[in-house]
Amino acid sequence: MWLEKIDIQHFRNYSEASVSFSPHLNIFLGRNAQGKTNILEAIYFLALTRSHRTHLDKELIQFQQNSLKLNGIVHRHSGNLPLEINLSNKGRVTKVNYLKQAKLSDYIGHMTVVLFAPEDLQLVKGSPSLRRKFIDIDLGQIKPVYLSDLSNYNHVLKQRNAYLKSTDKVDINFLSVLDEQLADFGARVIKHRLEFIKQLEEEADGHHSILSNQIERLKISYESNIPIQNSKDIREAFLTILNQNHKRDIFKKNTGVGPHRDDLKFYINDMNASFGSQGQQRSLILSLKMAEIALIKKVTEEFPILLLDDVMSELDNHRQLKLLESIDEEVQTFMTTTSLDHLSNLPPNLKTFLVKNGTIYEKQVD
């Protein structure tokens, strides 16, 4: 798939912009704080209805404006597909082929994206919430039912926590009813995640082996606070530990176990990657991104759109070369950079844009 064009209204520092893209490589050039990253963020937001930089929607709407609007035309094997998203203080309105979508899971997946940004380098050593977000975004794009199960789980979790906070005299029978619902959706969420991690590990290990000249093997472990013997027993194991934690949850007034507290661990040659060198960690992240592309292609039979936000400056020449070599010519790629000097072997069928003060100019590469 590829994004033919995007129309932007009141997004970040853009009042209005309309840009047509190459189906291959698109490079946004400009000094810092001109709006290069905002373009990639707009594409990401059009695909996923969320930002990778902030969880506050109001930060996305241009200063002194009340709403933003993004329109795009995506080319897929099945034909051209118009996408639209409107954001205001009343919430989001999403449309596919001009038809309003009732649920988030109905919208996400029509345009798949893989983002590689400098903050991704924190995936290994950062907080567990970053790794859960990584799973949710990738898995949600290839398996819409996961988003539905996750949404239902979070809804029941919110109910359970609100009830625990609302009273000092907890009705154990009512709490047990919530436990049953939480275990139903939580078990589904964990099963989806386990299947995804297994597939991701297979793809990422192969890429990491190539990057390390066949020296290193990559493993990914899903770390749950629920003892998982096999996928059939997850619900019962979750229910058991919820029951065992009743006293703790009543005292703390929150839910201490469940997939909302799970984590990922990465291992390089059986060593926790958080103790690895910076070079090893960068190779690991690069391997994950390559694996994301391959996995989305395998499941959806179409390549995702690749967003590279100023990551070339974070990679040495060897990793830059491996990244560029790994990008299939069918993958539409968007890249931001302050200079083309450090980039070599660029394809002839690219488009280059100069970004200055929230305005985008198409330019010719010398």
Curated annotation (Swiss-Prot):
SUPFAM superfamilies linked to this entry: P-loop containing nucleoside triphosphate hydrolases
Assigned keywords, A-Z: ATP-binding, Cytoplasm, DNA damage, DNA repair, DNA replication, DNA-binding, Nucleotide-binding, SOS response
Presence of keyword Nucleotide-binding: yes
Record GO biological process: DNA replication; DNA synthesis involved in DNA repair; double-strand break repair; SOS response
CDD domains membership: ABC_RecF (cd03242)
GO CC terms in record: cytoplasm
InterPro entries linked: DNA-binding_RecF (IPR001238), DNA-binding_RecF_CS (IPR018078), P-loop_NTPase (IPR027417), RecF/RecN/SMC_N (IPR003395), RecF_2 (IPR042174)
PANTHER family: DNA REPLICATION AND REPAIR PROTEIN RECF (PTHR32182:SF0)
NCBIfam families tied to this protein: recf (TIGR00611)
HAMAP family: RecF
Protein name stated in the entry: DNA replication and repair protein RecF
Organism: Streptococcus thermophilus (strain ATCC BAA-250 / LMG 18311)
Gene: recF
